[in-house]
Amino acid sequence: MKKIEMEGKSDDWCKNALARFRNVDQTSTQLAPAEKRTVEKTGEKRVRIIGPPEEKTCFTLALTVNANGAKYLAIVVFKTSSKTGKIPSHVLKSYNIPENVIVMGSRSGWWTKELDDEYIHLMYPENQDAPTFLLRDHAPVHTRNMAAALLKKKNVTQIFVPNCRIDEFQPPDATVNRTFKASFASKYHAWMSSPDRKQTKTGNAQNPSKTQFIHWVSEAWNEVTTECVKAGFKEACWKHISDEN
């Protein structure tokens, strides 16, 4: 890997260089993760483990960050039965979606090639004036010729994170995901232990609504700071770039 020399460069040069590097990470999550904690008070003789119903529904969450510390809109992908894979506009409106979140749909609930193409146009609405780089893993939808062609047309080069070293080279895995997941989990557990939560007839907590889930994502994403994002790139990428020739 070619060494990037930034010493002696102006602040503006460094800022412009860092702004050219983005990283996106898609991860599957559950609307109602399995609960192993008790919600009883400390000291109770009988302790019940009350969790949501057994049926779990998976969703995909995509988080994009920039080496300069910027964050982009968090993307939530819900499973939909629509033939087009699109969520109807009136349903989207009912979610009361926060400004820092985009909600999309697919028939599988996974990140599809159609969503990936839409993502590329969303992230890069115009061709980039200077060479720009997008760091991603080797997911099949990322390695498509169509994805490479779309990015190349916009002057964006795709850099694949080595499969065997994702935890080491993927910026979100270093700090961003850890911070986000901890915040999201704390909100879920607070909801689980709330006396106001609704329960089913059998005493199980009802699954959180999609609207609730979206707002947890929004709040947790807001809690990921610029410093956290920069630290992720420093730990995952730049320490390797500066050490290799």
Segments and roles (model prediction):
Residues 1-244:
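Phosphate-facing sequence motifs and polybasic nucleic-acid/acidic-lipid-binding regions
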